[in-house]
């Protein structure tokens, strides 16, 4: 049996690999036999836990203002070409009303790290959604906050929180973010969310500038340690108004 298939079988049976093994397996992402083996196992697990159901989420992107300056992001603070907007509380609640009538039972409030939306504003919005739709799940995706802020949102009625770690490798994190931002803080935010009882989502880009197979292996090891309820993984897509505009997009095959 070829080495990549051996590693795939090992991953299937024990649910983890060592870093060097992950790197070796990821390096064989174009090997058809290995891809088929892993794809069949992924399909088996999907069928086991979700069957053939498709779960719809009502995504409300309520602000694209952001105080951060992440080098890969189209809504980064210094992008003067971005057309900025904020939804009012009334507009957000109207979106929920329309979504509920269409059958949505999960609302995801997503936005940049916008100082306008203080803890008080977020708590008020979450409480109103919770009181109006007690049978719905409320997910937030609004970036890095203090543990106390996360606690307030949870007490107001939020159930889930999405915060992609983007990369678990310190050097790679520095390549993608300005020095004011911290990978250690990003990871601590995720741990705080877990401790507070949120269903927590992490995740990363595949093919981001400066990323190596070692970076990807460290991402997988970090996720095993964190054990989030949700993981979002997608290929890097270069944005025309960032310093990475001319970088190649990430590989869909490697992402899968």
What feature does the model see in each segment?
Residues 1-68:
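Flexible, acidic/Gly-rich N-terminal and inter-domain linker regions that tether
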Residues 14, 42, 70, 109, ...:
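Conserved, mostly hydrophobic/aromatic
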Residues 133, 165, 184-242, 255-256:
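Conserved C-terminal portion of the radical SAM core fold
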Residues 81-94, 184, 215:
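Glycine-rich anion/phosphate-binding loops
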Residues 58, 96, 123-127, 150, ...:
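Generic structural signal for well-ordered alpha-helices
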Residues 104-190, 194-199, 206-209:
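Conserved SAM/AdoMet-binding glycine-rich loop
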Residues 26-27, 57-60, 80-83, 108-119, ...:
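Glycine-rich, proline-tolerant flexible connector loops at the mouths of alpha/beta enzymes
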Residues 39-77, 87-108, 159:
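N-terminal pre-triad scaffold of radical SAM enzymes
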């Amino acid at each position: 049996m070829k080495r990549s298939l051996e590693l795939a079988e090992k991953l299937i049976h024990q649910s983890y690999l060592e870093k060097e093994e992950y790197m070796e397996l990821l390096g064989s992402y174009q090997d058809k036999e290995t891809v088929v083996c892993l794809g069949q196992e992924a399909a088996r697990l999907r069928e086991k836990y979700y069957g053939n159901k498709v779960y719809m989420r009502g995504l409300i992107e309520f602000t694209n203002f952001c105080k951060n300056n992440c080098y890969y992001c189209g809504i980064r603070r210094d992008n003067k070409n971005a057309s900025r907007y904020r939804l009012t509380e009334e507009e957000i609640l109207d979106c929920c009303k329309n979504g509920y009538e269409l059958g949505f039972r999960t609302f995801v409030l997503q936005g940049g790290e916008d100082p306008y939306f203080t803890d008080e504003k977020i708590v008020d919005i979450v409480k109103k959604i919770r009181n109006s739709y007690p049978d719905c799940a409320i997910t937030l995706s609004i970036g890095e906050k203090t543990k106390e802020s996360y606690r307030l949102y949870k007490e107001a009625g939020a159930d889930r929180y999405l915060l992609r770690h983007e990369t678990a490798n310190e050097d790679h994190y520095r390549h993608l973010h300005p020095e004011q931002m911290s990978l250690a803080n990003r990871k601590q935010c995720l741990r705080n969310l877990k401790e507070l009882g949120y269903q927590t989502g992490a995740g990363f880009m595949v093919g981001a500038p400066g990323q190596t197979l070692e970076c990807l292996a460290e991402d997988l090891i970090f996720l095993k340690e964190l054990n989030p309820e949700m993981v979002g993984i997608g290929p890097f897509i270069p944005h025309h108004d960032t310093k990475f505009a001319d970088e190649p997009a990430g590989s869909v095959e490697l992402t899968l």
